[in-house]
A protein has these predicted regions:
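Structural signature of hydrophobic alpha-helical transmembrane segments
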Residues: 6-18, 85-96, 138-151, 217-223
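Hydrophobic membrane-targeting signal helices
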Residues: 17, 21, 25, 54, ...
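Short hydrophobic "helix-edge" motifs at membrane interfaces and signal-peptide entry regions
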Residues: 8-10, 21, 75-78, 126-128, ...
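Short glycine-rich loop/turn motifs that provide flexible caps or phosphate-binding loops at active sites
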Residues: 21-22, 86-88, 95, 156, ...
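Transmembrane helix-loop-helix hairpins at membrane boundaries of multipass inner-membrane proteins
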Residues: 1-11, 26-120, 194-212
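Alpha-helical multi-pass transmembrane bundles of energy-transducing inner-membrane proteins
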Residues: 33-34, 117-124, 128-220
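Tryptophan-centered motif/residue detector
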Residues: 17, 71-75, 108, 133, ...
Length: 223
């Protein structure tokens, strides 16, 4: 049916960006801590509920990626908003959406200062993590990967305990250095395939057009 097909094509977008939409709405909330906590919990539970659509409608006998959406984003270079999941990323997405409301509940009585900022960062990080697990375009993947860095570093630096600033700076620096190697690998793959699309790159490797263990793999490993 058309309605079901339409949902199949947008469900990953809904699951990915619902937490971000919630974070943006939280920015306009008055500083009433209880209301902020309740709203963050509702958004995280809604995201988890939507993510359950994925395992229920996932066809285990089918190979390749499912719930795919592929739209041209940037013409030059050739960047697509391409998202999809396989049997591994499926459960990583569900695990992320399951753990987020637990994080909200666990922090309910332990976070007393900057409550709004805490939950905004938590919801932004949820969107970034889901994006990492569902992106099939390496440029979009890299964007989401870097997007996890800022909220995570701020959560450590603001809401951590002893030596929290040192820990946040160390985390930020190590992740940024590693990301340079990852970016180098992604650019190498684009230079040799003309595409950032994971499916296209995989097909070229399987067909022998690219070596199975190119130099870029070493940079990805370091990243």
């Amino acid at each position: 049916m058309r309605g079901v097909d339409d949902l199949q094509s947008i469900i990953l977008t809904l699951v990915t960006f619902t937490p971000l939409a919630g974070a943006l709405l939280l920015m306009f909330f008055p500083r009433r801590d209880r209301d902020i906590r309740v709203f963050a919990l509702v958004i995280s539970l809604l995201t988890f509920a939507m993510s359950l659509h994925l395992p229920v409608h996932f066809h285990r006998a089918q190979t390749g990626f499912q719930f795919e959406i592929d739209r041209q984003w940037v013409l030059t270079p050739n960047i697509h908003y391409h998202m999809g999941i396989d049997g591994i990323s499926l459960w990583l997405v569900v695990l992320t959406t399951f753990l987020t409301p637990l994080c909200v509940l666990i922090s309910w009585n332990s976070i007393h200062d900057r409550v709004k900022e805490f939950f905004i960062l938590l919801l932004i990080m949820e969107t970034a993590l889901i994006g990492v697990f569902t992106s099939l375009d390496l440029c979009v993947f890299y964007f989401f990967w870097e997007a996890t860095l800022i909220p995570m570093a701020l959560l450590i630096g603001i809401f951590g305990h002893e030596r929290k600033v040192y820990a946040a700076i160390k985390f930020f620096m190590y992740t940024m250095i590693a990301s340079v190697f990852m970016l180098a690998a992604i650019l190498w793959l684009y230079a040799h395939t003309g595409s950032f699309d994971f499916v296209v790159i995989r097909e070229q490797i399987m067909s022998g057009a690219l070596p199975k263990f190119p130099a870029a793999a070493q940079w990805l490993f370091l990243g």
